Amino acid sequence: MAMEDNIRLIVEQVLQELGKTSQPAAGGGCPATVADNGNDGNNIEDLAKVDLQRYLQVPEPKNRSLYEEMKLTTPARIGVWRCGTRPLTDTWLRFRADHAVAQDSVLGEVPEEFPAKYNMVSVKSMCESKDEYLTRPDLGRKLDEESLNLIRSKCRKGAKLQIIVADGLSSNVVESNITRLVAAKLQGREGKKNDAGTPSFGKFARVAIMDAIGEELKPEAAIVLLGERPGLGTAESMSAYIGYNPRAGMVESERTVVSNIHKGGTPAAEAGAHLATLLKKILDAKASGVNLH
């Protein structure tokens, strides 16, 4: 028999085996099944729509109720099953998909029209690109010369509160959370809106951009709403950093932070209401961070 005939025969046998449904091998093997579900490749299931907390993959768990309860306590990848020593295909694909979302969020940028849409003065750190922002955090804490001049000419000085929105390490956060968060926070400070300074948006900005802006505008307090480093499945997490008397040389321990603001953590509207209460406490005490008792 010619070599090509042997190869064709082997391929045909393999394809036949793949079309069969076999039982799991003894010793914890996995089922080798390829079922025809009528999917022609044009309607592939979106893995992102699967709720991992309710997706039970372990066959015949010893304590099913405890397994279900454990899964509901966290969105982390616990209680997944395996094929030999490898993860199942859907588990691996979901991991890759969530990792891609996190990468896109870090490397993405907020649309140029966003600041103007919400009447924010758009400023930029000394970073010239996203790559420089990721590798030079020191430059992300300082404003470039053009932004300094813009702040001096366009922003109100000596306000009670300066609101700063920053893209941070997750560009998805700004559009998904910021409008609801700011609206709730201002609603909590109803009747006191005129004590807020000109809101600003910082591109390629770190938390300490608060210090550079505070040094120029001299507000009593400042709040930075910033996109945090995304995790797997949590690419929209925001934190709010509040500093009393923001200025150059301010140390990290002087900032008060509220983190994990996203739909799977503290919802934006709820966080906004909490921040309004917290801001009042900080302004009354004239202190923030470890100095707030």
For each predicted feature, which ranges?
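Protein-protein interaction and targeting regions used for scaffolding, dimerization, and localization
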Residues: 1-45
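Conserved active-site and cofactor/substrate-binding residues in soluble primary-metabolism enzymes
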Residues: 2-9, 105, 118, 138, ...
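Structural signal for hydrophobic packing residues in well-ordered secondary-structure cores
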Residues: 11, 15-22, 127, 186-189, ...
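Flexible, glycine/charged-enriched surface loops at secondary-structure junctions
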Residues: 23-25, 192-198, 284-293
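Active-site loop/lid in soluble adenylation, ligation, and acyl-transfer enzymes
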Residues: 31-138
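Fold-independent oxyanion-binding glycine-rich loops
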Residues: 123-126, 166-168, 202-204, 225-229, ...
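Conserved mixed alpha/beta catalytic, RNA-binding, or beta-rich assembly cores of soluble enzyme
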Residues: 135-164, 168-221, 233, 239-242, ...
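C-terminal functional extensions of proteins
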Residues: 225-293
